[in-house]
Design a protein with these regions (language model features):
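Sec-dependent N-terminal signal peptides
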Residues: 2-11
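C-terminal motif of bacterial Sec signal peptides marking the signal peptidase cleavage site
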Residues: 14-17
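Peripheral terminal and inter-domain segments
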Residues: 19, 24, 370-502
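Short, conserved catalytic-motif segment at the N-terminal edge
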Residues: 31-94, 113-118, 133, 168-169, ...
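Short, well-ordered beta-strand elements
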Residues: 68, 341-358, 488-490
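Short, surface-exposed loop or secondary-structure junction motifs
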Residues: 76-77, 134-337, 341-343
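Short, glycine/proline-biased beta-turn/loop segments that scaffold the active-site neighborhood
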Residues: 118-134, 221
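Contiguous hydrophobic, core-forming segments of folded domains
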Residues: 347-385
Length: 502
């Protein structure tokens, strides 16, 4: 209650134009806490690089308005020789994945500060064609609701449509077909919900989101290597290539183009650039426009035992409290296809750290920033962050599907005549699925990408297919079950939408 009261007073003073009081006191930091923590960073980073085997990483720290540490480790692309040109440095550009959400919230805060929009602006006032399943929610849902993931949309709504190659407009138009949970009473992480809010902010500005981010955040802060466009990332000469983990080895396999959800996950940047942004967050976090983003707006993680602290989400920021009773702002970014990122800001210590990697997420950036935060606050690492994050990320890249790890039947029932299964099966949400028979084999294709997936007979009218995408890690297997003119696709049955008919 005391913290809430302080923030309430701060907001009142900002609105009235008075000078805000100093932050409330917290437990004193150990002597030379930040300098001592920074002195150990290189050793921590090198140890994590060696133990994880990831190809590359970059780290930066800001304190008292300055960048006091910025360094690269490892290589940008394991296919190339370990030359100076292939080594990661402070200016190497990485994809930052969902760390984009905090950057995008900063863009919105700039527009709120300019008076052109508000966190409480309803989306439909700027996007008249936008809709959700409930007309009442459609009328009320705001920019802030979407940035806090409290609209009621299902977790990661629309992400699988993106994997199939659908563009931003198509995915946003399909959100209205998804069932809603409690409006403003439930938390579910949605990339395309946040993207819809960003589109509303861009519409109010009369320009694309990508240009708006350039104009109000990246250019003013001197973030010359930062962009919300995938083509800019592709064209950087000093660029870290994403590496996918397959059989405990890292290799560049696929590139992740996140343009459809750019405000939520499509930013690319360097730690040198992100240091400018972290410095701004520390300097302007108490401003009227940014404060709502960096303070709790909804409970994102409920305690499972009395001794646990709840987790909160602001607008594009995780907001929590450390065991030293310090407010902590943070966010992670994770692409299965080869990117992992994390930043942590401790406003009361006036310090922030960011770590970027070019590999399938395994908890390395989170471990590094957590150990650094412990060193700053306590002078020592107090928790087994390596074990905690290793366990937390263990299932992140596990294959998906009910048949994963199962052995095909030794005496399966015969399949129906394959030509009888061929055809186009319609689905209002996913679009048509095409089953093609050629030379006694079936393939399935779906979505704009229309990648042909071989169908392998399993048992009777059940076939299987496997594929690799951002949400389908290596080893993923899905059932494809035929029943007359009906085709059921297990992987695409989220929200009960996996039935296709011809």
């Amino acid at each position: 209650m005391k913290r809430a009261a302080v923030l309430g007073v701060l907001m009142t003073l900002v609105v009235s134009g008075c000078q805000a009081p100093e932050r409330p006191s917290t437990m004193e930091l150990p002597a030379a806490a930040v300098d001592n923590a920074v002195a150990k960073l290189t050793g921590i980073a090198e140890d994590l690089m060696n133990s994880s085997g990831i190809p590359g990483m970059a780290v930066a720290v800001v304190h008292e308005g300055k960048t006091i540490y910025a360094k690269g480790f490892g290589v940008k692309d394991i296919r190339e020789d370990d030359t100076l040109d292939n080594r990661v440095n402070r200016d190497t550009v990485f994809q930052v994945a969902s760390l984009s959400k905090s950057l995008s919230a900063s863009v919105v805060a700039r527009r709120v500060g300019a008076g052109s929009i508000d966190w409480d602006t309803p989306l439909v006032s700027k996007l008249p064609d936008f809709a959700l399943a409930d007309p009442a929610v459609t009328a009320m849902v705001t920019v802030g609701d979407m940035f806090a993931h409290r609209s009621g949309l299902p977790d990661h709504a629309g992400d699988l449509l993106e994997d199939l190659g659908y563009d931003r407009g198509y995915v946003l138009s399909k959100l209205r077909e998804l069932p809603l949970d409690g409006f403003r009473t439930s938390y579910a992480y949605t990339n395309f919900g946040l993207t819809a809010a960003a589109e509303a902010v861009a519409a109010a500005a009369g320009k694309s989101w990508e240009q708006l981010a350039d104009d109000v955040l990246y250019e003013p802060l001197g973030m010359t290597s930062t962009s919300s466009r995938f083509t800019d990332y592709e064209n950087r000469s000093n660029r870290a290539v994403g590496h996918l983990r397959i059989d405990n080895r890292y290799e560049p396999r696929l590139q992740r183009d996140a343009d459809p959800q750019s405000p939520a996950g499509g930013v690319s940047s360097s730690v040198a650039d992100l240091a400018h942004w972290l410095t701004m967050i520390l300097a302007e976090g108490g401003s009227e426009a940014l404060l709502p983003a960096v303070t709790p707006q909804i409970v994102s993680r409920r305690p499972t035992e009395p001794a646990m602290r709840a987790g909160f989400y602001g607008y594009g920021f995780n907001v929590g409290t450390t065991s030293a009773a310090r407010t902590q702002l943070s966010h992670s970014g994770a692409f299965e296809l080869g990117a992992a990122a994390n930043f942590v800001v401790l406003p009361s210590a006036d310090v922030g750290i960011v770590a970027l990697t070019n590999a399938t997420p395994s908890g390395v950036p989170e471990t590094l920033t957590a150990e650094f935060a412990d060193l700053v606050q306590f002078g020592e690492v107090r928790e087994d962050w390596r074990g905690l994050y290793r366990d937390a990320f263990a299932d992140l890249d596990a294959p998906v599907g009910s048949l994963v790890g199962k052995t095909p039947p030794t005496s399966p029932a015969p399949a129906p005549p394959l030509p009888e299964l061929a055809g186009t099966y319609a689905n209002d949400y996913w679009g048509p699925a095409t089953v093609t028979e050629r030379d006694g084999k079936l393939t399935l294709s779906l979505g704009p990408n229309a990648e042909p997936w071989p169908l392998t007979h399993w048992d009777g009218n059940v076939f299987t297919f496997g594929f690799l995408s951002e949400n389908a890690p290596p080893g993923t297997i899905s059932k494809a079950s035929f029943n007359g003119d009906t085709l059921e696709l297990e992987y695409f049955d989220a929200e009960g939408k996996g039935t296709f008919t011809r």
